[in-house]
Amino acid sequence: MKALSVRQPYACAIAEGLKNIEFRSKPTSHRGELLICASKSAKGFKTDDGIMLPIGCMMAVVDVIDCRPMTEADKSEFGAPQNIDGWWAWVLNPNTGETVEPKNVNCSISFFNVDDELIIPIEEGKMWADF
């Protein structure tokens, strides 16, 4: 499956359905399933309960449904850059996110591939912090 690394806390926000637009400096023609992985950078983010957010691992499978230039209205979105020039909004379907076991993965700056057999959905009622 195609995968994309996203910095924390944004990777968790996408996995939890709280962030439905990923902002990137380049557009994508990709539509459909995309594995969101937490990048190895941006260490030190914690939940309100003090649990460290995971890094360098799989987080969720989402559907990319659109890619468009960023608009002024997007500035209010979680994680949005304030200068919209040259930024793209990768629109994710908020109803299709599926949290997966947070297995370690070698992330890359651009798209990379992860073997489908390694992607295991988490049982209902569990979250990444349960692993």
Describe every region a protein language model picked out.
Residues 1-131:
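Structured alpha/beta reader/binder surfaces that contact nucleic acids or chromatin modification marks
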